[in-house]
Amino acid sequence: MALIFIVFEGVDGSGKSTQLNLLNKYLSQKEIKTICTREPGGTPVGEKIRELLLDPNFAEIQDRTEALLYSAARAQLVAQVIRPQLEQGTVVLCDRYIDSTLAYQGYGRGMDISFLAQINELASGGLMPNITILLDLPPEEGLQRSRKDRPADRLENESLTFYHKVRSGYLEMAKRKPDTYLVLDARQTMEQLHRQICCRVGGLLGV
């Protein structure tokens, strides 16, 4: 089987983690070996970086610092988890990847896209997903969901204007890469989304 790397993207509260876990269960039932991971995080080093990035007490983190920290966590995850697992024939399911940096730091914060592309290339070694599943949701609804049961983290404290830019960035990237993007309306039911994801991924895996 070819190396299969599947990424879930979307604004906060779009249901990425839920759908990733449902897909993992579906593939496991088909006796397909999988591993689930996330960004930032997925390794001991990455999880420490995640704590720093999401801590609301560090609101002074500069944009460039933020982007480099995300890339550092990504470099560790690719080297320690993603690439070795792919080489073993494991299907890798990842909650966020490179396009999160482009959407949040590029479109959201207005950082130079070419600079972000360079550090992403260095961090990932050019490793790109076979498919990116974008769960598209109006930011108002996403933030309402994500803030429902816990305090907002540093990024969730950003303005709605910021999140609208992030969403627009995702949709623009999806238009540029139609062959590798699956864009779904995240306002659908959990079951409806799961069926569509399984259909697309099942076709990719031949199951």
UniProtKB/Swiss-Prot annotation:
One of its GO terms (molecular function) is ATP binding. One of its GO terms (cellular component) is cytosol. SUPFAM superfamilies: P-loop containing nucleoside triphosphate hydrolases (SSF52540). PROSITE patterns: THYMIDYLATE_KINASE (PS01331). Phosphorylation of dTMP to form dTDP in both de novo and salvage pathways of dTTP synthesis. HAMAP family: Thymidylate_kinase. This is Thymidylate kinase. It comes from Desulforamulus reducens (strain ATCC BAA-1160 / DSM 100696 / MI-1) (Desulfotomaculum reducens). The lineage of its organism: Bacteria, Bacillati, Bacillota, Clostridia, Eubacteriales. The gene is tmk.
